[in-house]
């Protein structure tokens, strides 16, 4: 394929984004409660009811008034032959004769016609579920034309032939209805079984920009693609579909949930210990070291001992006692003569005391400066070690990136472990560390952090419900407490979904769209309503009005047809 032709063909499906959209429908990413509305939407029950209504209306309209009146005269003659001693002109005889004929006519239709229609409806001859998936995901529907299912058609025809044999000795109305049923059902089966909507994994779709046409490929053959909602094609393809509009929120919720699970795993990993030496232990180690390596008369030991004891005492009286004890030990005098005899100290003693105090202050200041210098050096060492490790990590990542193709990171669609590669390779959960001297643990990471993904799930549920309700105009059915029981199609839903499937996909132009009053009714209730408003019911009621003048109020015909 030359470059000019390649530029004129744009791949639409499968692409990374289109496959993600179908996987979302299958519940792979962030399946929430609101997405269950899609299951209600793809239920083929509404189209099955529409097919049932079309077939039943068609067969009931096939009979003529002459057929009905002929059957009535035949039935009336048989009744008179069996009941020769009855008064044929009495109202009771006429009424019972007419009602028995009308009711047996209805029961025969239910037995021979409805049962065969039910078998056709439940034979899974449509691809309505996959059609709904394509509309939800891409707004494009590939349609495969194939040969009709002759095996299924012959099976249904054999059942209808058996029903026709049962009605062979009956009236002209039943023979006409069964003949019309066989013709209508055969036509429906040939149309519906010659259409197949493939799964998203079975087909490819391309857009020919030159012809402005979508073309599908199924098993190496070109197929037609019906455009329900046309996508926007620019630099990238943006599908005009509900799942495309929800995609960013769905993936964000999914990644947050995945991130929360990683946080649980990382924050609860086995940790040996974070050890730090206490202050008291440091002082005791210093004193023990001095006692082992120095004599008791060593002035360094005495000064350090004084500093340690002063640091351990927090009260004024305690500090005073420590100072007095130190002066007593240094002067080796147990009794303070000045306090005992009240004599004033001499000038020499005062000078010695002043010099001693200054020496103590100088030594204390020098020791504190040494400790501060040591702490600063240790902090600088840790800082530079951290920077070196960071630089090494960055160099390692750059080296790895050079070996791979460069592509911009996308947190929404990239793998979570790759997005959290730095956190994944962290050694915090695999090594033990010591707290440096003079440092404090600001965050121990022992408390578990989990992102608020539950709130995102609730928001996504509401977003799913809002999108589907407003896009397809569904209506909820609630109980007296206001709890939603289920959702059902409205007339707008029928127009938006059933209409394109009926006229664009299956090409059933002779079929009327279902009225929304039938979408949640049972088949028996629908059959009763259609029969009561059919041409056959009108003919039967007309015969009753003429044969039984007392029934002109319509009560008899309504009771019969509504039974």
Swiss-Prot record:
Subcellular location: Virion; Host nucleus
Gene Ontology terms describing biological process: chromosome organization
Lineage top rank: taxon: Viruses
Keyword Amino-acid biosynthesis: no
Pfam families the record matches: Herpes_UL6
Record field: transmembrane: none
A GO CC term assigned to this protein in UniProt: virion component
Major localisation: virion
Keywords from the named record: Host nucleus, Viral genome packaging, Viral release from host cell, Virion
Quaternary structure note: Homododecamerizes. Interacts with terminase subunits TRM1 and TRM3.
Protein family: Belongs to the herpesviridae portal protein family.
Function: Forms a portal in the viral capsid through which viral DNA is translocated during DNA packaging. Assembles as a dodecamer at a single fivefold axe of the T=16 icosahedric capsid. Binds to the molecular motor that translocates the viral DNA, termed terminase.
The protein, known as: Portal protein
């Amino acid at each position: 394929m030359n470059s000019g032709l390649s530029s004129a063909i744009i791949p639409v499906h499968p692409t990374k984004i289109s496959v993600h959209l179908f996987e979302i429908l299958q519940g792979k990413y962030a399946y929430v409660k609101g997405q269950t509305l899609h299951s209600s939407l793809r239920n083929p029950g509404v189209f099955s009811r529409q097919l049932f209504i079309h077939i039943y209306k068609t067969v009931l309209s096939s009979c003529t008034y002459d057929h009905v009146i002929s059957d009535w005269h035949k039935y009336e003659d048989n009744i008179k032959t069996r009941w020769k001693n009855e008064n044929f002109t009495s109202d009771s005889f006429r009424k019972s004769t007419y009602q028995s004929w009308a009711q047996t006519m209805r029961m025969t239709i239910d037995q021979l016609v409805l049962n065969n229609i039910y078998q056709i409806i439940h034979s899974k001859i449509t691809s309505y579920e996959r059609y709904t998936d394509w509309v939800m995901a891409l707004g494009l529907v590939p349609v495969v034309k194939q040969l009709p299912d002759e095996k299924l058609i012959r099976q249904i025809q054999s059942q209808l032939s058996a029903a026709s044999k049962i009605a062979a000795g009956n009236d002209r109305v039943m023979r006409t209805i069964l003949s019309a049923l066989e013709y209508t059902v055969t036509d429906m089966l040939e149309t519906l079984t010659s259409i197949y909507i493939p799964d998203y994994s079975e087909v490819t779709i391309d857009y020919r920009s030159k012809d402005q046409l979508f073309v599908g490929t199924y098993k190496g053959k070109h197929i037609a693609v019906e455009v329900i909602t046309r996508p926007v094609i620019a630099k990238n393809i943006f599908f005009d579909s509900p799942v495309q509009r929800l995609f960013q929120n769905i993936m964000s919720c999914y990644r947050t949930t995945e991130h929360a699970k990683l946080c649980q795993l990382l924050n609860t990993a086995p940790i040996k210990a974070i050890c730090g030496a206490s202050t008291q232990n440091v002082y005791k180690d210093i004193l023990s070291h001095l006692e082992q390596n120095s004599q008791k008369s060593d002035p360094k030991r005495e000064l350090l001992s004084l500093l340690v004891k002063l640091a351990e005492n927090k009260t004024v009286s305690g500090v005073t006692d420590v100072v007095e004890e130190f002066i007593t030990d240094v002067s080796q005098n147990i009794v303070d003569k000045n306090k005992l005899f009240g004599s004033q100290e001499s000038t020499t003693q005062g000078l010695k005391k002043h010099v001693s105090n200054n020496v103590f202050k100088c030594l204390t200041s020098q020791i504190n400066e040494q400790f501060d210098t040591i702490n600063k050096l240790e902090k600088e060492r840790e800082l530079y070690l951290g920077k070196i490790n960071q630089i090494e990590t960055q160099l390692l990542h750059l080296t790895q990136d050079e070996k791979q193709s460069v592509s911009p990171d996308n947190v929404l669609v990239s793998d979570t472990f790759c997005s959290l590669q730095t956190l994944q390779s962290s050694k915090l959960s695999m090594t033990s560390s010591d707290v440096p001297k003079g440092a404090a643990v600001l965050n121990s990471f022992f408390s578990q952090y989990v992102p608020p993904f539950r709130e995102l799930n609730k928001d996504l549920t509401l977003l799913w419900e809002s999108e589907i309700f407003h896009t397809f105009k569904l209506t909820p059915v609630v109980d007296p407490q206001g709890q939603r029981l289920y959702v059902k199609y409205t007339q707008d839903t029928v127009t938006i979904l059933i209409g394109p499937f009926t006229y664009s996909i299956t090409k059933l132009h002779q079929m009327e769209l279902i009225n929304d009053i039938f979408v949640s009714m049972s088949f028996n209730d629908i059959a009763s309503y259609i029969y009561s408003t059919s041409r056959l019911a009108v003919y039967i009621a007309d015969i009753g009005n003429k044969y039984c003048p007392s029934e002109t109020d319509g009560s008899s015909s309504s009771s019969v047809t509504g039974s």
